[in-house]
Amino acid sequence: MFTNPFGRKKDMSDDQKKNNQPDTEADNAENIKFAADDTELRAGDETDADFEMPEGFPEMDENMFGQVQEMMAKLERVDELEKENADLKNRLGRLASDFEGYRNRTTIESAEAHDKGVSKAAEALMPVYDDIDRALSLSVDDAAKLVPGMQAVQNKVLTIFGTLGLEATGREGEQFDPQWHEAIQVVAGDEDEKIVQTYQLGFKMGDRLVRPARVVVSRKG
């Protein structure tokens, strides 16, 4: 009988078979863990897209983003309107200041125009007063009848001048003042710079001369 030189391979025992077989349960558990880790990694790639905002915090979808942009545009427009409002206030302030200046100027000009009108009216009456004044100085036979009437007219004219704001100046006995008086003659006298005779009464309105008085002035010899 032929004998195998290598001998018959002895069958492995059950324990050896058991030890040499792969650990199926361990491998399966490892594979399951790997698959789970791989799933988590793939899920991590979608974190940004699938991230859930905390409860109560609105999602920033397209509609919300558009509303935010619209709100920002409105805020920018508010800033522009505030700047425009400030500019309009400045312009209004300048206009108010200009108007106040214009009103003051027109008030002054109106007052000056009124004074000039009064002066012209008074100047028109002055020759009448002068004629009356000269008539009163004439010596006539019926002076007793003429004088009272002429004096009444003269006083009436002076009253009218007073209502117009005119003040007579240059009467006899007043101190001579070159601002209001014009000396047409100088004569010797007991006092210097005294008006001894009035040829033509002068008139002034406040600080403004309407007509200088034409007078004769005394001077000590």
Curated annotation (Swiss-Prot):
Per its UniProt record, what SUPFAM superfamilies does this chain match? Coiled-coil domain of nucleotide exchange factor GrpE, Head domain of nucleotide exchange factor GrpE
Pfam families in the cross-refs: GrpE
Q: What InterPro entries does the entry give?
A: GrpE, GrpE_coiled_coil, GrpE_head
The UniProt entry's GO CC annotations, sorted and at most eight, read: cytoplasm
> Could you tell me which CDD domains the record lists for this protein?
GrpE
Subcellular location field: Cytoplasm
Question: What does the record give as the function of this protein?
Answer: Participates actively in the response to hyperosmotic and heat shock by preventing the aggregation of stress-denatured proteins, in association with DnaK and GrpE. It is the nucleotide exchange factor for DnaK and may function as a thermosensor. Unfolded proteins bind initially to DnaJ; upon interaction with the DnaJ-bound protein, DnaK hydrolyzes its bound ATP, resulting in the formation of a stable complex. GrpE releases ADP from DnaK; ATP binding to DnaK triggers the release of the substrate protein, thus completing the reaction cycle.
Family to which this protein belongs: Belongs to the GrpE family.
Q: What is this protein called?
A: Protein GrpE
What is the organism of origin for this protein? Deinococcus radiodurans (strain ATCC 13939 / DSM 20539 / JCM 16871 / CCUG 27074 / LMG 4051 / NBRC 15346 / NCIMB 9279 / VKM B-1422 / R1)
Q: Which gene encodes it?
A: grpE
